[in-house]
């Protein structure tokens, strides 16, 4: 058993060496609070609001409205917005250089990518101006007017597909499409029927209207004479007779 026993014998090992008397400034006092003047009666015993109570106001806190939100809420926007709400502008009046810990914290640098914080009136360090409700309504009105003028609202951004092609490229593409249209689709119908598909635009000519096929003979090539044909037949019969004699001689 220890010679010196005390309930606080290990207190010095876990005690802080500095004064823990600092804290981040808060926007609202911590709850619960023991001051009597902090509470204000708003409703009567029957549950109805008292007549002197201000009924106009935002009871859900100061958050962004519908017209201040971006078109698409992404993860990057949420991180940026959270960093702004978590007190990035608390030390606006104190220009200072960021330490290594703050440089490594990319979430803290979401609102301002600079390494040195400026003065209070520095435009790079001031709060970003959000879109007002009137500006949002004006944009919506402009969009509705444009959609009323034309059937479909056209995008102002020119895409890469609408880039003008060279005339040579247009000709080659036209030839390719014509060749594709000339081919007839394989169907169970006869060839003489009317074209129903765009690639059957060239209707085949019926057999009655087709001109008679004439085989053109070259002028330089002489025609085979009947005498030459008969001589060729006789030579073949002679060769056959000689082959039979050879086989008979081998057999003996």
Swiss-Prot record:
Cellular component, GO annotation: ciliary basal body
Biased composition, class Basic and acidic residues, residue ranges: 218-252
Biological source species: Drosophila melanogaster
Domain of life: Eukaryota
Similarity comment: family membership: Belongs to the Flattop family.
InterPro entries: Fltp
Name the record gives this protein: Protein Flattop homolog
Classification via CDD domains: Flattop
GO biological process, one term: cilium organization
Chain residue ranges for the region called Disordered: 177-252
């Amino acid at each position: 058993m220890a010679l010196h026993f005390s309930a606080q014998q290990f207190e010095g090992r876990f005690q802080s060496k500095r004064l823990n008397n600092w804290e981040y400034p808060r926007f609202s006092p911590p709850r619960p609070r023991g001051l009597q003047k902090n509470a204000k009666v708003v409703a009567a015993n029957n549950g109805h609001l008292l007549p002197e109570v201000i009924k106009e106001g935002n009871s859900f806190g100061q958050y962004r409205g519908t017209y201040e939100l971006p078109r698409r809420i992404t993860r990057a926007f949420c991180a940026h917005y959270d960093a702004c709400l978590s007190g990035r502008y608390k030390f606006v009046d104190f220009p200072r250089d960021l330490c290594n810990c703050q440089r490594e914290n990319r979430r803290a640098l979401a609102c301002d990518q600079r390494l040195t914080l400026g003065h209070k009136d520095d435009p790079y360090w001031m709060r970003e101006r959000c879109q007002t409700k009137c500006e949002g309504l004006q944009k919506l009105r402009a969009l509705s007017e444009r959609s009323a003028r034309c059937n479909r609202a056209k995008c102002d951004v020119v895409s890469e597909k609408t880039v003008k092609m060279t005339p040579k490229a247009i000709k080659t593409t036209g030839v390719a499409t014509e060749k594709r249209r000339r081919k007839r689709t394989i169907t169970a119908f006869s060839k003489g029927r009317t074209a129903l598909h765009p690639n059957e635009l060239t209707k085949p000519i019926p057999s009655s209207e087709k001109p008679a096929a004439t085989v053109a003979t070259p002028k330089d090539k002489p025609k085979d004479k009947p005498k030459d044909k008969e001589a060729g037949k006789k030579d073949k019969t002679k060769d056959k007779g000689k082959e039979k004699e050879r086989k008979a001689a081998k057999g003996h």
